[in-house]
From Swiss-Prot:
Gene: rae1
Any single Gene Ontology cellular-component annotation: nuclear envelope
Protein's cellular compartments: Nucleus
Stretches of the chain forming a coiled coil according to its record: none
Assembly notes: Interacts with rpn15/dss1 and uap56.
Pfam families on file: WD40
Lineage of the species this protein comes from: Eukaryota, Fungi, Dikarya, Ascomycota, Taphrinomycotina
Organism: Schizosaccharomyces pombe (strain 972 / ATCC 24843) (Fission yeast)
Protein name as catalogued: Poly(A)+ RNA export protein
Length: 352
C-alpha cells in the first residue's frame, strides 16, 4: 500500500526524520490508548483504550481513516491482537476477561477469564487446532483458549504478573514483574523452555519478537533496549543500548521505552517512548536508522502495518507518572506515519 502517494525514498537526507506527512486517525479513543494492531490481511487498525472500548479503523490509500467497528469491555482495555486470517480481533481487559470480535458478523463474545486483569492477548499456532488465543494476566498465569470452549485448554504458571508478551511462531515470549523473561517454544506450549532474567536493570515495559521468531527485543522504564537471541550459540550477538534520553551536561532525563515494533519485511525495528519521540534501528549493524522530532506528547504504543509502509503511533498518556498526572487536556491521538524504504532498510555495518 502506498500511503497517500508517498515516494519510495525520503526527502529528508539527514538523521532526523520528517513528520509533516503524518495523518491523524479520525474519531480517536476518548482516553489513554493502550495498544495498536494492524490486520495481517487488510488495512484495518485496531486500537484499545482506557475508555473500555476497542475501535477498528479502515485506513485508505489517501491516508484518511474510517471507523468500521467498536465494542466494549467493562473496564480499561490493555491489549489487542488479530487472528492470522484477519477475521477476528482479540482484546484483554482490566475486567479480567478477553473478548473476540468477529469482523464478518460484527459480534463479540467473551472467550477467556482470569482472576485478575488480562494484560496481553496473542493468537498462536499450537496444540493442533486453530485459532488458539493465549492470554497473559496479572494473576501470574498464561492460559490457552480454544474459542469454541469456555474453559482453558491449558494453563502455565508464571513467576510473576505479566507485563508484556509477544509471539512469532514458534516463539512465545512473556515478560513479567521482577524482570523475569519466560521463553516458550510453541511445539511444547505448556512448558517454559527458558526462564531468564532481563539484562536490563529496571522494570520491563515493552517486548517484541524478531520476525523470524529466533529472538526478541525488550525495553525498560529506564531508557534502555536489549536485543536477545534465543540460541545460546548466538549469545555473543546480544547487546543493549540507551535510547529515549535527553542528555544535559553530566545528567540525563531518562524516559520509558513504551513500545517496540519490528518491520515485517526488513526485521529492523522501532522504539517509542515517554519522551514523545520514536526512532528506527538496525539491530544487525547496531545503528540508528532515523530519529524523529517530538510529537507533542508521550507515545504509549505503536505498530507497523503488514507491508511496513505505515507506522502507526499513539500520542497518549502512558501512566508512567501515575493517576494524579492524567488530565483531560492531554492529547489522545493516533497518527499514521508513511515509511519510505530508505528510512527503515538495513544498512551495512560501519567500517565495511
Amino acid at each position: 500500500m502506498s500511503l497517500f502517494g508517498q515516494a519510495t525514498t525520503s526527502t529528508v537526507s539527514n538523521a532526523t526524520g520528517d513528520l509533516k506527512k503524518d495523518v491523524e486517525v479520525a474519531q480517536p479513543p476518548e482516553d489513554s490508548i493502550s495498544d495498536l494492531a494492524f490486520s495481517p490481511q487488510a488495512e484495518y487498525l485496531a486500537a484499545s483504550s482506557w475508555d473500555s472500548k476497542v475501535r477498528i479503523y479502515e485506513v485508505q490509500a489517501t491516508g484518511q481513516s474510517i471507523g468500521k467497528a467498536l465494542y466494549e469491555h467493562q473496564g480499561p482495555v490493555l491489549s489487542v491482537n488479530w487472528s492470522r486470517d484477519g477475521t477476528k480481533v482479540a482484546s484483554g481487559s482490566v475486567d479480567k476477561s478477553a473478548k473476540v470480535f468477529d469482523i464478518q458478523t460484527g459480534q463479540n463474545q467473551q472467550v477467556a477469564a482470569h482472576d485478575d486483569a488480562v494484560r496481553c492477548v496473542r493468537f498462536v499456532e499450537a496444540m493442533g487446532t486453530s485459532p488458539i488465543l493465549a492470554t497473559g494476566s496479572w494473576d501470574k498465569t498464561l492460559k490457552y483458549w480454544d474459542l469454541r470452549q469456555s474453559t482453558p485448554i491449558a494453563t502455565v504458571s508464571l513467576p510473576e504478573r505479566v507485563y508484556a508478551m509477544d509471539c512469532v511462531h514458534p516463539l512465545l515470549t512473556v515478560a513479567t514483574a521482577e524482570r523475569n523473561i519466560c521463553v516458550i517454544n510453541l511445539s511444547e506450549p505448556t512448558k517454559i523452555f527458558k526462564l531468564a532474567m532481563s539484562p536490563l536493570k529496571f522494570q520491563t515495559r515493552s517486548l517484541a519478537c524478531f520476525i523470524k521468531g529466533d529472538g526478541y527485543a525488550i525495553g525498560s522504564v529506564e531508557g534502555r533496549c536489549a536485543i536477545q537471541n534465543i540460541d545460546e550459540k548466538n549469545a555473543s550477538q546480544n547487546f543493549s543500548f540507551r535510547c529515549h534520553r535527553n542528555q544535559a551536561g553530566n545528567s540525563a532525563d531518562v524516559y520509558s521505552v513504551n513500545s517496540i515494533a519490528f518491520h515485517p519485511q526488513y526485521g529492523t525495528f522501532s522504539t517509542a517512548g515517554s519522551d514523545g519521540t520514536f526512532s528506527f534501528w538496525d539491530k544487525d549493524s547496531h545503528q540508528r536508522l532515523k530519529s524523529y522530532p517530538n510529537v507533542g506528547g508521550t507515545i504509549s504504543c505503536s505498530t507497523f502495518n503488514r507491508t511496513g509502509d505505515i507506522f502507526a503511533y499513539a500520542i497518549s498518556y502512558d501512566w508512567s507518572k501515575g493517576y494524579t498526572f492524567n488530565n483531560a487536556q492531554l492529547p489522545n491521538k493516533i497518527m499514521l506515519h508513511p515509511v519510505p524504504q530508505d528510512e527503515i532498510k538495513p544498512r551495512p555495518k560501519k567500517g565495511r
